Amino acid sequence: MKVYINDTKLINKKFYPLELFYSGYLPNIKSNIDPKKFYTIMIVDEDAPSKTNPINKYMIHLLIINNKTTIFDYKPPNPPINSGPHRYHVLVYEQSNIIDKFNINIDSRPKFNFDKFVLTNILKLFDKFMFQTERI
């Protein structure tokens, strides 16, 4: 998987300054998907509000189903001040079927039940990427 912010190609598992994500550009996510299949794409923060106290794990920063149906628009990383580095996961899941967006019952971005969503929708991990950032 390749992830770009503006012209910056991110490197898997690297740390980036928070300002990079406030450039006004959406992330450009590239993966070798099969155009005949359907995928779910998400970006989640597992360290919300902090790695030592992740009570809002997982915070959704992007959720797209069926290749192009947006459930949650992109929201740039926004970790609390002095909460330490946050790990942001960019995930692409292959879907076994088309997901009915009206059957998705997610009320808010924090406390996303990641495991339940994957199991309920019979998703298979296809590609993954992780970057870190923090607010000092």
Role assignments for model-derived ranges:
Residues M1-I136:
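N-terminus-centered regions that define maturation/targeting leaders and the start
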